[in-house]
């Protein structure tokens, strides 16, 4: 992600509402990134693991982070990184809040 211009701010942010794997900045955007790994597709693709329930949990945790950091009015988005073996897929703006 750093090679793509992301500035990594925090790994494994945790609060009482949940966890976010990676928080970064991409230009003006604060990016909340979920990273999912699968050695193979027997358990489904890593991207399928970020279901609606997981998305809501990430969203609530991100809003908590922004409030905690007094960043309520900054633009943000939710990206997902799927890793299958050696293949890495980045989906920018994978879901909304």
Regions found by a protein language model. Give the residues of each.
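Short, conserved glycine- and acidic-residue-centered signature motifs
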Residues: 50-55
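A short, N-terminal amphipathic alpha-helix
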Residues: 60-67
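Domain-level recognition of nuclease-like catalytic cores that cleave nucleotide substrates
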Residues: 68-97
């Amino acid at each position: 992600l750093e090679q793509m211009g992301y500035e990594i701010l925090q790994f494994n942010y945790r609060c009482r509402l949940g966890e976010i794997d990676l928080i970064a900045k991409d230009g003006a955007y604060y990016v909340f990134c979920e990273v999912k790994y699968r050695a193979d597709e027997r358990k489904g693709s890593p991207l399928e693991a970020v279901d609606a329930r997981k998305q809501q949990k990430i969203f609530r945790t991100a809003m908590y982070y922004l409030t905690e950091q007094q960043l309520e009015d900054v633009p943000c988005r939710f990206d997902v990184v799927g890793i299958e073996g050696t293949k890495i897929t980045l989906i920018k703006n994978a879901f909304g809040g």
